[in-house]
């Protein structure tokens, strides 16, 4: 089997691409980074360093090559040849690749290819593949829409693996370092044709429970560790979470967001408490050097209505659950400053010019005046 994977960055190589290759697939990475693509084409393999309490080893990933995703003709040709398409490009890039996907699907169908094809976006967002499908359909010729609905599966997924950036290795410049833990859960109800047998890909018919469990716990906790750690003067996630006051705050935030999950999906409280502890331990992994600015980047996206801070807060409001720590976490996110991050600069500018209340309303889209006032007060008393 052959897979086309968009995004040859650390997540693509260290997580999704590795699982596909480990399952015997030939993996073609598509990316705009010429140097990475040239290395993939010439070396046809790379190393993945897996680190944790009980493991510190390098595994080779083979049967890989690359294509420049700006080469639309090559991408369209590959869409007709492959059995699976995956992405790990970041939520903002899905809009950009959608027009190429539309052209490629039109060409595949126009050429008489009636084999089903599944597309899985492996992004840090809720129902990222459904979003990609919407974007693709805005570019799709109406004459092809019925056939695309019939033959192309747009499969939502939840992904979880911490893959921090590392300095390139001189001998193996494609080497990527990852934590031992990984989780890739896909919505089995959305596949067309046979579901591919991929080691490490779990199937579920209740994906939203796992999407929100990850978003409300790993993503919420990671962001809060970053924002509060930065606020306290730390540079790395590991040193932030080793500060007992940071750890206690992050845990209390995850407990509040966890109460929403328990109420909404019936998760076992003890099992979820253990899941929180496992995540706190992952943040403290001594082998992962993860910068708070990498984790905290794009604060406006992370403060948006359906993302890791506001969505769990909305759940606490819906169910009448405690949320003092989530309120404080959002206030801490508002304090994030980074001269190299356009969103952080925009956030600081809005706070200075429009004030905290209008900034909260604009970027979070919250309507509840009392909740907005509580966030504003928490921000002003940081």
Swiss-Prot record:
MF (Gene Ontology): mannitol-1-phosphate 5-dehydrogenase activity
Catalytic activity, EC: 1.1.1.17
InterPro entries assigned to the protein according to its UniProt record, in alphabetical order: 6-PGluconate_DH-like_C_sf (IPR008927), 6PGD_dom2 (IPR013328), Mannitol_1_phos_5_DH (IPR023028), Mannitol_DH (IPR000669), Mannitol_DH_C (IPR013118), Mannitol_DH_CS (IPR023027), Mannitol_DH_N (IPR013131), NAD(P)-bd_dom_sf (IPR036291)
GO cellular component: cytosol
Biological process, per Gene Ontology: mannitol catabolic process
Gene: mtlD
Top-level EC class: oxidoreductase
PROSITE patterns: MANNITOL_DHGENASE
Residues that coordinate or bind NAD(+): 3-14
Pfam families per the UniProt record, alphabetical: Mannitol_dh, Mannitol_dh_C
NCBIfam families per record: PRK02318.1-2 (NF002646), PRK02318.1-3 (NF002647), PRK02318.2-2 (NF002650), PRK02318.2-5 (NF002652)
SUPFAM superfamilies per the UniProt record, alphabetical: 6-phosphogluconate dehydrogenase C-terminal domain-like, NAD(P)-binding Rossmann-fold domains
Similarity comment: Belongs to the mannitol dehydrogenase family.
Catalytic activities: D-mannitol 1-phosphate + NAD(+) = beta-D-fructose 6-phosphate + NADH + H(+)
UniProt keyword annotations, A-Z: NAD, Oxidoreductase
Protein name: Mannitol-1-phosphate 5-dehydrogenase
Listed PANTHER family: ALTRONATE OXIDOREDUCTASE-RELATED, MANNITOL-1-PHOSPHATE 5-DEHYDROGENASE
């Amino acid at each position: 089997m052959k897979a086309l994977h968009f995004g040859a960055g650390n997540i693509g190589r260290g997580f999704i691409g590795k699982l596909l290759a480990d399952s015997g697939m030939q993996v073609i990475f598509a990316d705009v980074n010429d140097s990475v693509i040239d290395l993939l084409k010439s070396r046809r393999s790379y190393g993945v360093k897996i680190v944790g309490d009980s493991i510190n080893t390098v595994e080779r990933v083979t049967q890989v090559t690359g294509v420049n995703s700006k080469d639309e003709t090559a991408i369209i040709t590959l869409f007709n040849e492959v059995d699976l398409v995956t992405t790990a490009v970041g939520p903002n890039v899905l809009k950009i690749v959608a027009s190429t996907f539309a052209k490629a699907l039109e060409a595949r169908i126009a050429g008489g290819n009636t084999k089903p094809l599944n597309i899985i976006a492996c992004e840090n967002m809720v129902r990222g593949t459904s979003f990609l499908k919407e974007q693709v359909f805005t570019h799709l010729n109406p004459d092809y829409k019925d056939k695309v609905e019939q033959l192309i599966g747009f499969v939502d997924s939840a992904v979880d693996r911490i893959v921090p950036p590392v300095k390139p290795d001189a001998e193996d410049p494609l080497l990527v370092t990852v934590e031992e833990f990984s989780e890739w859960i896909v919505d089995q109800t959305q596949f067309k044709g046979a579901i591919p047998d991929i080691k490490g890909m779990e199937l579920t018919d209740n994906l939203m429970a796992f999407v929100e469990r990850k978003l409300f716990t790993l993503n919420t906790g990671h962001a809060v560790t970053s924002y509060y750690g930065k606020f306290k003067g730390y540079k790395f996630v590991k040193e932030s979470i080793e500060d007992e006051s940071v750890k206690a705050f992050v845990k209390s935030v995850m407990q509040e967001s966890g109460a929403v999950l328990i109420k909404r999906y019936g998760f076992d409280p003890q099992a979820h408490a253990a899941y929180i502890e496992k995540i706190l331990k992952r943040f403290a992994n001594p082998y992962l050097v993860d910068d708070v600015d990498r984790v905290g980047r794009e604060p406006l996206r992370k403060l948006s209505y359906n993302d890791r801070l506001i969505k769990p807060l909305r759940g606490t409001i819906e169910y009448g659950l405690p949320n003092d720590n989530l309120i404080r976490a959002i206030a801490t996110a508002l304090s994030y400053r980074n001269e190299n991050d356009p969103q952080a600069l925009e956030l600081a500018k809005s706070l200075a010019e429009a004030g905290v209340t209008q900034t909260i309303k604009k970027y979070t889209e919250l309507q509840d005046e009392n909740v907005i006032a509580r966030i504003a007060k928490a921000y002003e008393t940081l």
